[in-house]
Each structure stands twice: as C-alpha cells, then as structure tokens.
Amino acid sequence: MTRMIRNMKYRMIDLFAGIGGIRIAFEENGAKCVKSSEIDKYACDTYEKNFHEMPLGDITKIKPEDLTDFDIITAGFPCQPFSLGGLRKGFEDTRGTLFFEVARLIKAKKPKAFFLENVEGIVNHDSGKTISVIENVLHDLDYNFQWRVMNASDYGTPQNRKRWYCVGFRKDLDIGFEGQEGKFKVIYNFPSKCVLKFKVKDVIEANVSDSYSVSETCERNINTYVEKFKEGPR
C-alpha cells in the first residue's frame, strides 16, 4: 500500500498547519498541497517563508466552496484540551470542539482519505469518552479508519514523542487495514518500527570548548535530560 501511494499524485489540504511539518511529509511522498489553514500569526509567518504562501485563517470561517477539490485532508487539531500538560478539558474547551470543524469539512467535501494527529492523552481523556465520540463521528461520515499511538523514536527520530495518529479512507474505495476482518481491494499497513543506530551518549562529545559554556542552571537542566534520555527509549 505504501509503495502504491508513493507512485500516485494526489491533492491535500493542510488544516491546523502550524509551520508545515505534516505538509512536508506528505509532499515528500507525492502530494500536492492545494490549501492550508492556520490561525497563529507567528506560525503563519514561518509557513509563508517555508512555502511562499499564506494559509487561510480561522477554520470556523472556512466555507467548503472556498476549498479547491482535494483527495486527502490532514489535521493536527489542537491538542491542549487533551494534553497531560494542559487543563484536560477536552470538548469543554473551545479548542477541543475544533475537531468538529474538521468533520464538517470532511462531510462537505468527501475526500478519499484523512490523516489526523493529536497527543496520546486523547485516548484516555474523560475515561475514553472523547475518543469514543471521535470514532462515532468518523463512522457516521462513512469512513473506514484505524488509529495508533506511535512513538517517534520507533520510526527513526531520536526523540521520545508519542502521538495519536488516525488514518481513514472513504468506504467506497474498499481499503482495509492489516488485521481487519473482511475482504478489501487494498490493505493499508501502518509503518513498521525500526531500531535507531545511535543513542544520545554516542554523539555527545566528552570535552568541548569554553565558548559553548552555559549558565549553571542551564547546565543542570541539560544534565538532567541527558541522564534521562542517554540510554534511549525504555
């Protein structure tokens, strides 16, 4: 399935685009971004420098007819309402309801596929009720989907960064997932894990120039993180 996707040319829109990280990944695999949306001024400025175009603003003000036809919708919708580091208000937080703005555009435009991203905390938020609502909405939109919590360190990135990823396909395309019951024309496989060749302690020099010195407080903080991560994921 991955090889087939790379050989295809498809159009995408990039919602909650930030500075364009998701867009870069999709473009490296054959996508053409036809529209993006981001509300943060500073993120928009960086996005414009990266891609020479300014994203649309507030997603709640975007009308379906404002969007060029596209095949895939991507959305890293706000994670703060569901994050361990946030207030964990979920759908009670205005930002949490922005998932329904994504659903609104999916319903109106019926793209072939979607890719959603959030923090891992969304899975257990509100005793699982939040993820249940999201699943029910996506089912009602008539999409076949699966989600995973994946750690960036398992896929070639030297950082422990767990995120929730959800991939979905319009049901009429007859695309299923590995291990899913039923017969499908095409099976989608989530990426396989890989082993990192180096740990942090393998690349940090033992002796460095005084010109790179930092404050004692900063040094203590750095040493704390080095000790925590030098052995790699556990």
Predicted regions and their residues:
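Generic N-terminal simple sequence motifs
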Residues: 74, 107, 154, 187, ...
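Solvent-exposed, flexible loop/coil residues
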Residues: 66, 71, 86, 95, ...
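S-adenosyl-L-methionine-dependent DNA methyltransferase catalytic core
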Residues: 1-33, 137-141, 163-234
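Core alpha/beta nucleotide-donor-binding catalytic domains of modification enzymes
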Residues: 2-112, 120-132, 139
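Short, solvent-exposed coil/turn linker segments
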Residues: 58, 63-66, 151, 170, ...
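Class I S-adenosyl-L-methionine
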Residues: 145-165, 169
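A structural signal for conserved, well-ordered secondary-structure elements
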Residues: 116
